[in-house]
Amino acid sequence: MEGYLPKKHIKVIEQASDWKSAVLLASQPLLKEKLITQEYIDNMIASVHEHGPYMVLTDYFALMHAKAGVGVNEQSMSLLVTKSQVDMEGKPIKIFLVLAAKDATSHLAALSQVMEVFMDDDVRETIMLGDKETIVNIFN
């Protein structure tokens, strides 16, 4: 799983003012490295407005994404953990995983491995504790 979620793409904060701010913060490492554009971030936010919190896959975990290829310069992921939960359209979130896919299929192997981590309740609880080094070690 090494390389899918490098240390520089993992952030831990105390709290975010709202879910949109959390998505912006979660996306910053990818935007800074020009792996995605602002359009991709805007599209993720618009998707939640249009379709509701469907990106919330399990308690406290949102897999943020938008249409593959649009605003994506390179396949990449980033992670934001908020120690205080953030409300996303009625769903409490502490973990925001941003997935930027270049196309419909090339990201599936990486996504599968990362999702195994987040679907493990014990590991997800450990991630929510917010110790960055522990989180980095889980993914690298």
Residue ranges and their predicted role:
Residues 1-140:
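Cytosolic covalent-transfer regions centered on His/Cys nucleophiles
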